[in-house]
Each structure stands twice: as structure tokens, then as C-alpha cells.
From Swiss-Prot:
InterPro entries: Alpha/beta_knot_MTases (IPR029028), RlmH-like (IPR003742), tRNA_m1G_MTases_N (IPR029026). Keywords: Cytoplasm, Methyltransferase, rRNA processing, S-adenosyl-L-methionine, Transferase. It holds the Pfam family SPOUT_MTase. This is Ribosomal RNA large subunit methyltransferase H. NCBIfam families: PRK00103.1-4. SUPFAM superfamilies: alpha/beta knot. S-adenosyl-L-methionine binds at L72, G103, L122, S123, D124, L125, T126, L127. Belongs to the RNA methyltransferase RlmH family. It comes from Variovorax paradoxus (strain S110). HAMAP family: 23SrRNA_methyltr_H.
Length: 155
């Protein structure tokens, strides 16, 4: 199974990249994790619709056809660790490759969000982009550890 994280925004602080790399190397070979950063559309005097369209095109270009699309959205479904572990297990059981999408500073195109298979949120708090990436990869690893009976997650 492949987990693809598509994130709008390319430059992350060193600490965020270090944290991402640390968690990414922990995943087992049967659960391939990949990060694809896509360029943020410069705001300038462009309308929000123009920004959304440009970023949506880049996001869709990064996602292989047939992947389950899960967007991170502040209004998405809140999940516990166990619920995320159950989702991960279901995706694996169905043989789905999953693209998890993190929007840019202006969020994601509303039509793209509406067309996604699922919308989840990481927190009720507003998170900086770098923190969202790190939190997502940590929670995905934690979900895997719950399913694998690995001692990383403790109740």
C-alpha cells in the first residue's frame, strides 16, 4: 500500500524536514510513504478562484488515478488515534493507495474538497503548515503501530 502526502508549499523549516524524515524511515516496506510538495500559487492580485484552480491542477497532477483522496480540512471529521488506525487498516484491506492532501495558506478548492473520498482534521486548533505535515506523519506512524501491535503507542 502507498500513502502519498501531497502538500501545497515547498519550503519547510529544517526541523520539520528532520521530523518528517525521522518518522518516514520508521514505516515498514509494505506501507510506502511518499511526500510530494507542490508549488503554492503566488497571491498577488489574483482572485481566490484563480489560486484554487492553479493549486488544484498541481495537486491533481501529483496524484495517480484511482487513489483514494483524503483531504485535511479544519471542518473534516475528527478522528481518535484508534479511529485513524481503523481507517488505515480498512484502506489496506481494500487495497487502496491513499493520497492525503494538505492545502496551502488559502486552503483547498471547495470543489476539490467536496469531491474527495474523505475529509479529516488533525486538530481543532489552526496549525502552521510545517506542523501539520509533522503531525500527520506522526499520527500515520502511530496508527500503523496500533495495528501492528508495536509498542510505540500506549494506552
Amino acid at each position: 500500500m502507498k500513502l502519498l502526502v501531497v502538500a501545497v508549499g515547498q519550503r519547510m523549516p529544517d526541523w520539520a524536514q528532520t521530523a518528517w524524515d525521522d518518522y518516514a524511515k520508521r514505516f515498514p516496506p509494505e506501507l510506502k510513504l511518499e511526500l510530494r510538495a507542490v508549488k503554492t500559487e503566488p497571491r498577488g492580485s489574483k482572485s481566490l478562484e484563480t489560486l484554487y484552480a492553479a493549486e488544484r491542477e498541481r495537486i491533481e497532477g501529483a496524484i495517480a488515478k484511482g487513489m483514494r483522496i483524503v483531504v485535511l480540512d479544519e471542518r473534516g471529521t475528527a478522528l481518535t488515534t484508534k479511529a485513524l488506525a481503523a481507517r488505515l487498516q480498512a484502506w489496506q484491506g481494500e487495497g487502496d493507495d491513499v493520497a492525503l492532501v494538505i492545502g496551502g495558506p488559502d486552503g483547498l478548492d471547495p470543489a476539490f474538497k467536496a469531491a474527495a473520498h474523505e475529509r479529516i482534521r488533525l486538530s481543532d486548533l489552526t496549525l502552521p503548515h510545517a506542523m501539520a505535515r509533522v503531525l500527520l506523519v506522526e499520527q500515520l506512524y502511530r496508527a500503523w503501530s496500533v495495528n501492528a501491535g508495536h509498542p510505540y503507542h500506549r494506552e
